[in-house]
Design a protein with these regions (language model features):
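A conserved helix-loop-strand patch within extracytoplasmic ligand-binding domains
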Residues: 105-159, 242, 260-264
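Short, well-ordered beta-strand elements
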Residues: 24-38, 55-62, 156-162
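A local structural motif
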Residues: 51-62, 157-159, 177-190
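Ligand-binding "clamshell"
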Residues: 93-122, 203, 215-229
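Short helices/loops that flank or line small-molecule/ion binding pockets
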Residues: 48, 68-79, 174-179, 192-207
Length: 296
């Protein structure tokens, strides 16, 4: 009789464990790189997931080293979700040659990540945070500069500035100059946080920017067109371990609610609210999600 009871209890325990597994994990870990945009995106993901699922989110925000430390942690299962950029995945992680077509890039990086790392890319958010070149409004009007090709015709009269890393990157200064035949009057190294001040003070004429920078819409800043598409696309999207998706049916559909929902203008505005107006990323994320009707 005792043996029968013990067998019954053992069977019930196994059944309970199986049911628990089928219900999925209770917690997922969301990470971000140490930059304003990533803090906002991580908050958007956190609030969306907690509103639309029964999952509890643990945040690991501002991880030093960014992709170089987050990616191995995802492979090891220490991190489940984080926002990434197509160009970073393709060029930095996979070490592949640049692809100018954004859709081809997305397709190839998605396939490679799934095959090599068992990591899934969501659809792209919509915005493209790539490199760009900015000049002052006065310079743009004085020289009639609208494109990089326009800039090339007068580059010998202008001073170019970028952060030190840009001069060292394979896809940075030297290759850019070669493609467009720039012959700048002078070049300067400048801290990434001082670029816009340098442009405003007329210390330099051209600066490198990221195309979702908080200050990119300032009145005196003009972004010129990369008319030969030198810079690779860096479209934002969510990365998630496939194991987590397998354990939580429906989670991918929740992440897909952000597909094509964040334009460059919207990302710039959110970055501006946090960096310049000092708003809490949690508040900015919540306002965005409510405006889009994605949470109540």
């Amino acid at each position: 009789m005792l043996k029968t009871i013990m067998k019954t209890l053992s069977g019930m325990m196994v059944l309970l464990l199986m049911v628990g597994c089928n219900q999925g994990v209770d917690k997922i870990v969301i990470a971000s790189k140490p930059m304003t945009e990533q803090f906002i995106l991580a908050e958007i993901l956190t609030q969306l997931i907690e509103d639309r699922t029964d999952l509890v989110v643990e945040q690991k925000l501002g991880i030093g080293g960014g992709t170089s430390n987050i990616h191995p942690a995802m492979i090891n299962g220490e991190i489940d979700v984080y926002p990434e950029y197509t160009g970073t995945g393709w060029l930095f992680v996979l070490q592949q040659d640049p692809i100018s077509d954004m859709n081809e890039l997305y397709e190839k990086v998605s396939i490679a990540y799934l095959e090599e790392f068992n990591i899934v890319w969501s659809s792209m958010y919509g915005f493209n945070n790539t490199y760009g070149l900015a000049i002052s409004k006065d310079v743009a009007e004085a020289y009639d500069i609208k494109t990089y090709s326009d800039l090339a015709t007068v580059s010998s009269e202008l001073v170019f500035a970028a952060n030190p890393d840009f001069y060292e990157r394979e896809d940075g200064y030297n290759a850019l100059v070669e493609m467009y035949n720039f012959t700048f009057k002078d070049t300067k190294e400048i801290d990434i946080g001082l670029r816009y001040e340098a442009l405003s003070s007329d210390d330099v004429d051209i600066i490198t920017v990221f195309t979702t920078d908080a200050r990119i819409n300032e009145e005196n800043v003009v972004i010129i067109e990369d008319d030969r598409t030198y810079f690779n696309a860096y479209h934002g999207a969510t990365l998630i371990r496939k194991e987590v998706l397998d354990e939580n049916p429906g989670l991918f559909d929740v992440l897909e609610l952000l597909a094509n929902q964040i334009s460059n203008e919207e990302m710039i505005a959110m970055n501006y609210e946090v960096e310049i107006e000092n708003k809490d990323p949690k508040v900015v994320a919540s306002e965005f999600l409510r405006e889009k009707g994605l949470i109540e």
